UniProtKB/Swiss-Prot annotation:
Proapolipoprotein C-II is synthesized as a sialic acid containing glycoprotein which is subsequently desialylated prior to its proteolytic processing. Proapolipoprotein C-II, the major form found in plasma undergoes proteolytic cleavage of its N-terminal hexapeptide to generate the mature form apolipoprotein C-II, which occurs as the minor form in plasma. It comes from Ellobius talpinus. Belongs to the apolipoprotein C2 family. This is Apolipoprotein C-II. It is found in: Secreted. Component of chylomicrons, very low-density lipoproteins (VLDL), low-density lipoproteins (LDL), and high-density lipoproteins (HDL) in plasma. Plays an important role in lipoprotein metabolism as an activator of lipoprotein lipase. It comes from the Eukaryota. Keywords: Chylomicron, HDL, LDL, Lipid degradation, Lipid metabolism, Lipid transport, Secreted, Signal, Transport, VLDL. The lineage of its organism: Eukaryota, Metazoa, Chordata, Craniata, Vertebrata. Residues 78-100 are annotated as: Lipoprotein lipase cofactor. The gene is APOC2. GO terms for molecular function: phospholipase activator activity; phospholipase binding. GO terms for cellular component: chylomicron; high-density lipoprotein particle; low-density lipoprotein particle; very-low-density lipoprotein particle. Residues 1-22 form the signal peptide. Residues 66-74 are annotated as: Lipid binding.
């Protein structure tokens, strides 16, 4: 068991040494240039904004009042049904827990 412990300790120290070395190399890079993470975040944010704007434009171009009314009606009916079933389920669970 002592050799396993030493092997595990050696591996942990090796990983920590690699992390410290990588952190030092990152600090030695030019501090004036933005980090890779910042570039990735900006790129993803740009793509997201573009996709959101395109989706909003498409929605506004294809907006139909009758479809919107049907969707609202379907949502209200389904949420009412889910509320009913959730209350029935809650009542059944409480009955099982109380033992009535």
């Amino acid at each position: 068991m002592g050799s396993r412990f030493l092997l595990a300790l050696f591996l942990v120290l090796l990983v920590l040494g690699c992390e410290v070395q990588a952190a030092q190399q990152l600090q030695q890079d030019d501090p004036g240039s933005p980090a890779l993470l910042d570039k990735v975040q900006e790129s993803i944010s740009s793509y997201w904004d573009t996709a959101k704007a395109a989706a909003q434009d498409l929605y506004q171009k294809t907006y139909l009042t009758s479809v919107d009314e049907k969707l609202r009606d379907m949502y209200s009916k389904s949420s009412a049904a889910m509320t009913t079933y959730a209350s029935i389920f809650t009542d059944q669970i409480l009955t099982l827990l109380k033992g009535e």
